[in-house]
Amino acid sequence: MKLFLDTANLGQIKKLNQMGVVDGITTNPTLIAKEPGEFEEIVRAICSEVKGDVSAEVVATDSDGMVSEGKRLSTIAPNVVVKVPMIPEGLRATKSLSAAGIRVNVTLVFSANQGLLAAKAGASFVSPFIGRLDDIGQRGMELVEDLVKVRDNYRLKAEVLVGSIRHPQHVLEAAKVGADIATMPPEVMEKMMHHPLTDAGLKRFLDDWEKAKKTRASGAV
């Protein structure tokens, strides 16, 4: 499974990208607005840092506007994926953009029916938001399971890109059910690296090594 970061912060991206664990980036207008600089400059800088897919979202709400924005965004870098919302106008834009050879990530997917429609319209990625479903008492991972089954049953080309991830367990569950990609905030990826037994084990190794050095040094005197 590919692991993406859901952020537009270049510092965080560079830090984690150096570890060789970042396959791509997803952004949205909220994340972009938190960073200094112009929208396209931020996306261009991210695309230079990360060689994998970088999703950049349109802000238009009509299909013509989405197509126009999407075509402009696609010229920023070859690894840009145009992100559009799962609304009727978004489906129209997805059909037009994909027909023009531009890859599309359909976002804000909250049902398998929406995901199926997005895939049929030509989306390269379908993004279910599991954390937000959990927030309203539904089990978000059931949606991922349904989308994976539909993808496999009909050999759809759209990849299941799981978003709205809140904790490492979400990532593990997405991997176990066969999602193609999980995108997460940097802090979730950092939490995935740690375990208290790892920290305790390392401390013990280092403490034992220091004791051994002191013993050897005192014995040599």
Language-model features, listed with the residues they occupy:
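Glycine-rich beta-to-alpha transition loops that act as phosphate-gripper elements at the mouths
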Residues: 6-8, 60-64, 84-88, 106-113, ...
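Glycine-enriched alpha-helix->loop->beta-strand junction motifs that scaffold or abut catalytic
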Residues: 20-24, 51, 76-79, 96-105, ...
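Conserved, mostly hydrophobic/aromatic
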Residues: 28, 82, 118, 174, ...
